[in-house]
Curated annotation (Swiss-Prot):
It is a multi-pass membrane protein. GO terms for molecular function: hydrolase activity, acting on ester bonds. Glycans are attached at residue 40. This is GPI-specific phospholipase A2-like PGAP3. The lineage of its organism: Eukaryota, Metazoa, Chordata, Craniata, Vertebrata. It is an enzyme of class 3 (hydrolase). One of its GO terms (biological process) is GPI anchor metabolic process.
Amino acid sequence: MAGRTARLVLLAGAAALASGSQGDREPVYRDCVLRCEERNCSGGALKHFRSRQPIYMSLAGWTCRDDCKYECMWVTVGLYLQEGQKVPQFHGKWPFSRFLCFQEPASAVASFLNGLASLVMLCRYRTSVPASSPMYPTCVAFAWVSLNAWFWSTVFHTRDTDLTEKMDYFCASTVILHSIYLCCVRTVGLQHPAMASAFRALLLLLLTAHVSYLSLIHFDYGYNMAANVAIGLLNAAWWLAWCLWNQRLPHVHKCVAVVLLLQGLSLLELLDFPPLFWVLDAHAIWHISTIPVHVLFFSFLEDDSLYLLKESEAKVKLD
């Protein structure tokens, strides 16, 4: 829901700096990378590098040049620390200690755990809620969209490339749009299916235009951030308005808690500090903190779907 929006805010802010940060602008860093590439990334030296590179590193797409950048990043960080200076960023990111092929280990693991939580709750939902429940198809579709987004988040934090970055951004946008569609179906779509269908078509059109513009014309981080934040805030406000209108329902407090928790946890994204132990930064902490929120939201969807099923069955009996 709105938590994905906060994540996009951080990503957009970091990406805006990606063209040049203090660390990668340092002559010592640039000279180090240049010398490393000349020494290791051509001819026989390159063959030697490839022969000793672990298979998981090559499968993840780590090149000789990438390895040079990684090693020179730590050389530069060491010099900064020796001089008593603050740790610099490189290409818009803090320096992270690589583990195996994982570029940002904590965020990658946290993204995987978020996806695992979504998968477990999807299985529980499908076991507990009959397919005849009015919200069943929409909730199941939302779960699959979320799983796909967390998969690409895991991939992106494992290996940051242009492709994985775009897939992470686009899939996050898809989750936000599907969440607001889920809200539309729950609030007005069950009574007015045609309205929900029209809204779905509009959202698909918006997503297509959004992805096409960013992919084919210009990858504008500021526009991407503004668009997703606007939709995310509308989504949160819509859910809260529905909760206020239906506060008599015993399970509504779960939805309120989810929206408020996500808004509160989003403040973690405003923290910006070098990774603790070169692994754990504010973004990773935010990812970790959202795991129980997914469990709570799917618990709400399960309770609400069973409530709607019971209500629809009662109407059939009355008819």
